Amino acid sequence: MRYEVQTYMSPQEVMEMAISFFGVGLDLELQSQGFGSLHFVGGGGHVTLTTRDEDPVSVELETREWDAQVEEFMARIARRRWWRRLWKGVKEELA
């Protein structure tokens, strides 16, 4: 299954969170890592994550056997953090 979500996190933050969520949290093996992409395998399936540096950042996920966990990850990164909104407002006022 393929999914796409937008986030206000940076691509680096998304990658770090994915490694923590899928690798450490779900014990999937990080099989490959490239510029803006990660590929995890385990439990008879896989998760592939690719980021595109846009505003907001676009994250594409492809999975087999890990759909519920991918949907949970998407919900976590899609939340807009209150401090990001605050910082954006401060930057606009200072400009």
Sequence positions of predicted segments:
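Terminal, regulation- and interaction-focused segments at domain boundaries
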Residues: 1-30
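Short amphipathic alpha-helical segments, especially helix-boundary/capping motifs
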Residues: 12, 33, 47-51
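Alpha-helical structural elements
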Residues: 16-17, 35, 61
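Residues that act as N-cap/strand-start positions at coil-to-secondary-structure junctions
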Residues: 24, 32-34, 43
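Short, hydrophobic/aromatic-rich segments at coil-to-beta transitions
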Residues: 32-39, 58
